[in-house]
UniProtKB/Swiss-Prot annotation:
Binds 1 zinc ion per subunit. This is Formamidopyrimidine-DNA glycosylase. Its cofactor is Zn(2+). GO terms for biological process: base-excision repair.
Length: 274
């Protein structure tokens, strides 16, 4: 599943080509993905793209006629093409945003769990207003994390993956961050110390920043808009490495289902207090 670094990578890849352009048309081949594609998108011809941004895992295309919200879902990807070199759409190519300059932003999604939505203002859209702070923002502090964790009996891995607490810390990066902080994924969030919250906040930011620099993580479906894979998978410490030796201590990496998601950890580097 594309997570925050992958969406940020998409944003940085397509923004130089789309910002300031005028939409010629939006071709919708599949009327329903996770939700029905907003009918307003069919009336975007002639709208100027003012800017692009990201909120959590939503890519937002700001136009003079409202905002287009794109979510990649489980298997979605965006590719930049040029109409001067037409490429036939595959059965999984559901949406094309075409500019008057001939640039095509093509959305591919084999599992159709993504979304193309419209809002007058993205920041007021219900799916956006309930989100927690961005993990790379100044509002995501260790003090905030510590206060939010009080009286939370849920496992810390589920806690940091909760978008009401902080957005964008998906399964891969939660496992990696907890390893870097030396925190067992099953530790109850309320048992986090202030020192651990400082460490956890710092490593979440470090892990996500590094993943963005590496272009995200390619495990199966994700590719960058230019077709290249993300390279963060090459430096994963624990995720997907069950039975392999920990790069720090040599202990075998373990895996356990926590909150219906596979979680990876080193039992020695991340001991669970008794």
């Amino acid at each position: 599943m594309p997570e925050l670094p992958e969406v940020e990578t998409c944003l940085r890849g397509i923004e130089p080509y789309l910002a300031g352009q005028t939409i010629q048309q939006i071709v919708i081949r599949t009327p329903k993905l996770r939700w029905p594609i907003s009918a307003e998108l069919c009336a975007m011809s002639g709208a100027k793209i003012l800017a692009l941004s990201r909120r959590a895992k939503y890519l937002i295309i700001h136009t003079e006629r409202g905002d287009i919200l794109v979510h990649l879902g489980m298997s979605g990807s965006l590719t930049l093409l040029n109409s001067s070199q037409p490429t036939k759409a595959s059965k999984h190519d559901h949406v094309d945003l075409i500019t008057e300059a001939g640039i095509i932003l093509r959305y591919n999604d084999p599992r159709k769990f993504g979304a193309w939505l419209w809002a007058k203002q993205a920041e007021n859209y219900p799916l956006i207003t309930k989100l927690g702070p961005e993990p790379l923002s100044d509002t995501f502090t260790s003090d905030y994390l510590f206060k939010k964790s009080r009286n939370k009996t849920v496992a810390v891995k589920n806690f940091i993956m909760n978008n009401d607490i902080v957005v964008g810390v998906g399964n891969i990066y939660a496992s990696e961050s907890l390893f870097m902080a030396g925190v067992h994924p099953e530790l109850a969030a309320q048992n986090l110390t202030e020192k651990q919250c400082v460490q956890l906040r710092n490593v979440i930011q470090a892990v996500l920043t590094k993943a963005i620099i590496q272009g995200g993580t390619t495990l199966k479906d994700f590719t960058q808009p230019d077709g290249k894979p993300g390279y963060f998978a090459q430096v994963l410490q624990v995720y997907g490495r069950k039975g392999e030796e920990c790069r720090e201590c040599g202990t075998l990496i373990q895996a356990k289902v926590i909150g219906q998601r596979n979680s990876y950890f080193c039992p020695d580097c991340q001991p669970l207090p008794k």
